[in-house]
Amino acid sequence: MEVRSRAYLAGALLPGQRATSIKLALLASVCAPALFGAISLAASSPAVAACTGPGAPNNTQTKCVTAVQIPGNPLRSFDISFVSPDRDEYYLGDRSNKGVDVINTNSLAFVRTIIGGSAACSGCKFVGIVLNTKTGAVDNNHSGPDGVASHGRWLYAGDGDSTLKVIDLNIAGPNAIVQSVSTGGSTRLDEMALTSDGKLLLGANNAEDPPFATLFTANGDDATSHVSKITKITVDPTIIPPGFGLSIEQPAWDPKTKRFYTSIPIIANNPPGCNYGQLSGAITCDGGLLVTDPTTLSTPTAVQGAFDPTTNTGVVKLHACGPNGATVGPHDNLLLGCTPGNNPSDTTTLVINAKTKNYANIANITGSDEVWFNKGDNRYYLGASKAIGGAVLGVVDGTSVLIETIPQSANSHSVAADSERNRIFVPQVAPVAVVGIGGDTTAVGAGICGTSNGCVAVYEHKVDHDEDEHGDDRRAER
């Protein structure tokens, strides 16, 4: 197996120039069995025989160290993850247990599942799993929680009823929701991103037709919650035509350009005459990247069109990429999780510079949903659930080189990393025999978890900080 495309995008490429792929030897294979034993998670949690099998190889740089067990229902459906290194906490939108799971990133102990409202939001609760009445599968468009993001004491979670749930993490126990704000839609509020100061939040209603994003005021470092809607953002219908189930996906905030960058899986006429769903047969249109300046949006609604280089706003056309995930890495580079789940011809992952729009394709890794840049080791981590050959955790360094891939349970699409300890958290679904449609159809997850209930796998990349060069931007809010 080979990896390709080392590309220092900042300054190395001329405007519009595409990086040339170069072959590099794979740094580590991923087929050896694990040699790691069980690790006790907490005094109240029994040790389990975790980190075995294909998902825990002993010859990779990224090592499986334990599996955190989630009390309650086996994990059938979950969505986005987030880490707050300042609070030493990991958060997971856990639909199976109708809440947001919290794990301590230092002790690796399960802390709680936040499920309901405080006195300030009596009756507030998450939707949980909603099933498709015809197929029995999870209805992703109406289930929740979905996307999560945090700043300081405030955790924000999108829900299946098109609401933004605001959680005060300083409130102990399971009932910490203090506010619920509707986007006005009828389907889930999905992935989201915060500005670095935590005062603005952009969330995507990916399942609406046409899809839209909402810009909210957020709480920053304030002591009380006052979240409200500012603007509903749609994309010009010539770019995202209504009536075909097209979507927008993961936003990311770049503090240098002061823009939100939101992945768009499929856009019309990219290239001209392509199929975005208006024709029979496979999708052939590539995706786009929506660039949003929150200071110039009209209210209460705004429509964004084609990319305008003079304002650095609008939809950038992508090549050979229909992305889901988006994350900001070093030098204002964004890694986009291209996936054959959007365009069957996708075989790579894309890195694009936020300023120049120069780009490079990374070979031998595709199919990502959530992607995350970890400043602690200057690496991207990819939840590649639609990877060719089966779900993997992808590891790409800050110069756009694929380091390794590690097998994961089927549908393992969520990932977040703790930059303080370089621990990577990857939730695993329970086996299909336990939870039904949507469960793990391989034995990989059970080997990682040590149980048949699913878990949150914890990987670690040990770094010599005296020699490591980090990216120059702190991994920020999504």
Predicted regions, residues:
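Intrinsically disordered, low-complexity segments enriched in glycine/proline and serine/threonine
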Residues: 5, 20, 26, 438, ...
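Bacterial N-terminal signal peptides
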Residues: 15-16, 23-43
